[in-house]
Amino acid sequence: MLNEHGRRLLLGPTTQRRRLRQILDREDCVTMATIFDPVSARLAEQLGYEAGLMGGSLASYAVLGAPDLIVLTLTELAEQVHRCTRVSDVPLVVDGDHGYGNALSVMRTVHELDRAGAAAVTIEDTLLPRPYGSSGKPALVSFDEAVARVEAAVAARGDSDLLVLGRTSAATLNGIEDAVARFKAFEAAGVDAIFLPGPQQREQIDAISDAVKVPLLMAGAPEALCDPAYLATRRVKAWSAGHQTFSVALKALHDSMQLVRSGTLSLHLPGQASKQLLEQATGVPEYDEWTRQYLAGGA
């Protein structure tokens, strides 16, 4: 909807956050869109997604063309989040990684992502970035530090509607007992929901769902677990099987560039977006209205 000046009326961060909270109160499980830039954010809204997920890997790919090794800065992440939230009403769950440092850094991370318009921020207890001399195997910070990080994240919210999600990979790295203990401690620290990355078995999801009362969100799982009906029974309210849509887009770009490099005329490339889709994805109708109102002069 446009206002009298031709500006599309966005709901604003608080309303988006309340929409996400409403999703967490429902009985079903929604699929989150992969969002990594303003175009994907607009498409997610136009296609009717109720929530989106910006993974740390996606942000690093889109902003730096770099792998997910914590070389992206907090400033760069917050800027990319804002670019997405300023054009779309889809509530955005943002991967805050380890919070870019200790508990004080976590507070700064939550503050900046709050200002950028994130609907929810995940904070994890993985030891990041990879320390010197490590074998490359992921490791977790201590139990006490993990809880302190989450407590700091909850305290740092400027808007009480911003959701803080506690995340740990303990089920994969240390076993389900440690994962359950950490998630229960995160719940006691005040998180709004648990974010479960990469579960491999239903038994893991069942154990965590039985141990906590707050809702669950999930991302990355084998095909056997990609069953929204089952996930809904375990109080998983939003999920993503992975970021394969980014992979598909990358392959399409690679293949089309390869065809042009080999002599195909770009006009003849297969699979091109229609003019209408391109204009919808880039906000052309809105800009056309502004142009008519403010650049036409006396014509």
From Swiss-Prot:
Q: How is the cofactor bound?
A: Binds 1 Mg(2+) ion per subunit.
What does this protein need as cofactor?
A: Mg(2+)
For this UniProt record, the keywords arranged alphabetically read as follows:
Decarboxylase, Lyase, Magnesium, Metal-binding
Keyword Metal-binding assigned: yes
Say which enzyme class the record assigns: lyase
Q: What biological-process GO terms show up in the record?
A: oxaloacetate metabolic process; propionate catabolic process, 2-methylcitrate cycle; pyruvate biosynthetic process
InterPro entries membership: ICL/PEPM (IPR039556), Oxaloacetate_deCOase_bac (IPR023687), Pyrv/PenolPyrv_kinase-like_dom (IPR015813), Pyrv_kinase-like_dom_sf (IPR040442)
EC number(s) recorded for this UniProt protein: 4.1.1.112
What GO annotations for molecular function exist for this entry? magnesium ion binding; methylisocitrate lyase activity; oxaloacetate decarboxylase activity
- Indicate the segments annotated as coiled coil, or none if absent: none
Look up the domain of life of the source. Answer: Bacteria
Q: Which SUPFAM superfamilies does the annotation name?
A: Phosphoenolpyruvate/pyruvate domain (SSF51621)
Q: Report residues binding Mg(2+).
A: 95
The UniProt annotation places substrate binding at 57, 167, 243
Enumerate the catalysed reactions: oxaloacetate + H(+) = pyruvate + CO2
**Protein's job:** Catalyzes the decarboxylation of oxaloacetate into pyruvate. Seems to play a role in maintaining cellular concentrations of bicarbonate and pyruvate.
Family affiliation:
Belongs to the isocitrate lyase/PEP mutase superfamily. Oxaloacetate decarboxylase family.
> What is annotated about its quaternary structure and interactions?
Homotetramer; dimer of dimers.
UniProt-recorded name of the protein:
Oxaloacetate decarboxylase
